[in-house]
């Protein structure tokens, strides 16, 4: 397979997945392939290289049934930078509004010649359903509270860039754990790399059941501050809840928000990340979000690199399997 980024090397023989549905099912080797190839793209960006002819003629369609700024734009740019074209599918003006099933919609898009579909949906399992009914690559861009694999990958890539090996490191994931697909993808990926994970938030949003995934849980941010090497600060997802899980935003921020005082009590080299969008003054104060220990904008840049790697790898596996 031709590419004008020789640093990518030969297509990895161990990568055989034409879909990316989540991080739970990946092997450690597959996870490392994704991270290593994403790092190649990120290094190229840092050297001023922005456009490649790696996927000429490839057409990717973004099927988003939930709002998105970063993820949808990032996937579109990723396709374009690989030399592919990207089409944004508008669900509200499509035949879905006339009663067509999502599977029939996907089959019709495939019949028009698309090679990959990037899918976001509020219902867990929709990307998997589509992967069982079409031949093109399906990439999960978030399905309900199940998984958001590319967000998990870019979070982990950012941690690796700052910390090196994650073996033995401790990562705190703080906030709305109950409704977070990001938390789940982080846990699955981090555990495969030997990291320790603590999920933290109000008792209404963090259940002891998380111990079944091999992680620790806590209802006190202050108690874990000096133990963690990384804090991943999640927003509260009010759109997935019918009632507020705590008395007030102010109380939540006082107990679980990261501010300058907590930052000074944490490890001096603590890394702070957040998947975005962030609510300034709730989970993070501007002092923390914009400070030197924050890697939020690095995450955004890494997201583009991750999605380029995912598109390249899944397309390669699709071609090899056909």
Range-by-range predicted roles:
Residues 136, 194-196, 265-271:
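A short helix->loop->beta-strand "cap" motif at the edges of active sites that frequently abuts
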Residues 210-287:
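Rossmann-like adenosine-cofactor binding region
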Residues 2-77:
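Positively charged, low-complexity intrinsically disordered leader regions
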